[in-house]
Amino acid sequence: MTTKQTSYIFVSGGVLSGLGKGVVAASLGFLLQNRGYKVGVIKCENYLNIDSGTINPIEHGDAFLCEDGLEADMDLGTYERFLDYDMGHCNFTTIGQIYKKVIDRERSFGYKGEDVEAIPHITDEIISRIKKAGQGHEILIIELGGTAGEYQNMLYYEACRIMKAKQPNRIINVHVSYVPLPQHIGEPKTMPTQLSIRTVMSMGIHPEFLVLRSIAILDKRRRYLLGLKCSVPGNNVVMSPDVKSIYEIPLIFAQQKFDKKILKELNLSYRKSNLDEWHKLVKKISKPKDKKVKIVIAGKYFATGDYELSDSYAALIEAIKHAAWHLNTEVDLKFINTEDIEKQGVKLIGKPDGIIVPIGWGSRGAEGKISTIKYAREKKIPYLGLCYGMQLACVEFARDVVKLKKADTTENNPQTPYPIIHDIPMSSKYQTIKGKNTSMRLGAYDCYLSDKTQIAKIYKKYKFCKKVSDIYKKKNNITAVGNCVISERHRHRFEFNNEYRDILSKHGMIFAGTSPNNMFVEMIELPKKIHPFFIATQGHPEYKSRPNKPHPLFIEFVRAATK
């Protein structure tokens, strides 16, 4: 399909950040996809970073890890969970990527002596990226990052204006804005939205639709008057109220016929939709729960000033919820900063039903994580370690069970006499080279599971693995033990040191999964006779969980917590 056949929907935001443009874009995409349209999506970010991988999660939330190794904005996780297909490099761009591409082209004489400027050269590159993302899709949704009026995103808006001028019948604009309801006044105030629309219009963009974020649904009269003041037809003012679960939003939009109105505006035909499965999902989420469990997430990316943010672990929290809904269980999440555990001890953990140590970097809070893992192991509390949570579980086991007291990671202690975790070789054969002295093992990798392990049984139970023959393994030089193959996403630059595999095995640790060449330890567990549920993975199963397809490891972790 050529780009001329693709229709484009730009989603912008006003008044404040964090409105939920990503949820609006994903919900609209889901509804159009449900009608049989091939829907693509791309997030256009404002920052100069090439990707989200080097940004502290406290600054911009959880960097979402894609199958192809892209470290992207967390909105791509929202897209995956709603649209149920994998995102990648074509679904994400930053202004840093755009500038780098243009400058590299200029340095290579790609502009043949032209005076390279923001307009048209930067805007042309933006438009080129958008059209490339639209290839193969009937509809492409473009989420513009940031808030209307910020200087950082003005070139995205200019690119949108240019595209609209060239293809007026193929492009529409949806503006998401906030309508506050101050308690001391007692009525919604629409002036912030009016000013936001004026800002967008001053850039030559006239939204066809207005999506209002508010505590509650505005009455018809206010929607009509607001539409009149914003030059948006009253029927095209759509409500997106606060809800208990974001998965309710597609149904709320469908009730307002948002998708039908979009198709009419684009002169696209109506196709039948069937939202039965989504209704079942929302019903499952909202119905009373049979059980309740308390889960501790022990990390360090929670606090920002006096406030606690959950966005730093957005994908993890979603994965836990998906599993809990599957088991009709209510989850009470408790966030504990492991630096506080270092100062005050494991008494902070209390008596949870399950403990998770997620991704992390560096020495800050690492000893608190190790203490948490020891607490989970000795108290026989169900434990799930993710990435750093697996590495530090190996360190804790080496210190406290094998009695290698000074065991550590070379990341935190380069001089450790027992480097249980060490650097992955700096080679493109094993890692993605991101820059000078900067590398990472990124993206989806296969893992072979030992057949009789708990982990293999879990993946087989939910049909998340495939079985291969010994003949296939021999033909492809696969030396890993086991015939059960899975794939998980990875994001790390340190690995388990295989010199310590035998001694840890002799003391009870099971190396349940490895890379095909047996080089990388991917999964560990403790036998059930030692611990009811102690599983850790170098991968990131949280990024593959979907609301209607919860990840097996999270299902069984939550199940263990209920016991």
Language model: regions and residue ranges:
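Rossmann-like NAD(H)/NADP(H) cofactor-binding core
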Residues: G40-I42, K334, L384, T537
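Short gly/pro/ser/thr-enriched loop/turn and capping motifs at secondary-structure boundaries
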Residues: L48-I50, Q391-C394, N413-T416
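Cofactor-cradling patches in redox/metallo enzymes
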Residues: P358
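Flexible phosphate-sensing "switch/lid" loops adjacent to ATP/NTP-binding sites
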Residues: M1-T329, E339-G354, G362, K369-Y375, ...
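Repeat-solenoid scaffold signature
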Residues: R377-A393
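Amide-donor transfer/coupling interface in amidating biosynthetic enzymes
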Residues: Y79, I122, I215-N236, P241-H322, ...
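Glycine-rich, charge-decorated loop segments at or immediately adjacent to ligand/cofactor-binding or catalytic sites
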Residues: P182-K189, Q391-D400
